[in-house]
């Protein structure tokens, strides 16, 4: 496997691959900053049977990606870089006929908006090349889709309503910190929310819809309706669906800090002069 990325999510993926060394006998960790990849190798090489190599690559540069894939010859490319780089990595996989997996859908770097249309447009080309692209294979999206599909297949004739509730019960003691890449997290939270009702998208203002939910073993948490990519794919694949919504929990300290950043213009996507 070729793993592209060396951030927090990549760290989880790399550890999981090394825990399953009978499947992932060899991995190459590649990122713009090779020293980060080397750090993972140093930490894990004595704890796993997986053979680990590292490489430097700019995931925005398709020829660089192609050269790395031709040199390493992976069976699969696991993309845990930034969502802006999805299409470049998919282009390289097409050229080298390598199967592709990612955890978040593409979004343009200059616009805080994400949807599947750009990646779904690759379907025919991947089919013709005889390779597979598994999109949004993290937890949400990913496991949430598996839960819904399993419920449809084994428990229900049809499903009319789906609410996905994303709650983090941990507390690291910081007044402001994100669960994953700060830029992506802040863009997601500050963008307009949306949900699907009777086959149509309904748009809301950012953080407009709030609910309080009592989570098992965690307790009551404030949660807010967000736009999220699995709404698109579930609406296409779940029979009888009338409404799908996605909620995520946030503490007031997080939201206050985010509002301060917004007020001083630091949530904008245009360059600062």
Residue ranges and their predicted role:
Residues 1-8:
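Conserved N-terminal Rossmann-fold NAD(P)-binding element of oxidoreductases
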Residues 57-74, 81, 85:
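Conserved Rossmann-fold cofactor-binding substructure of NAD(P)-dependent oxidoreductases
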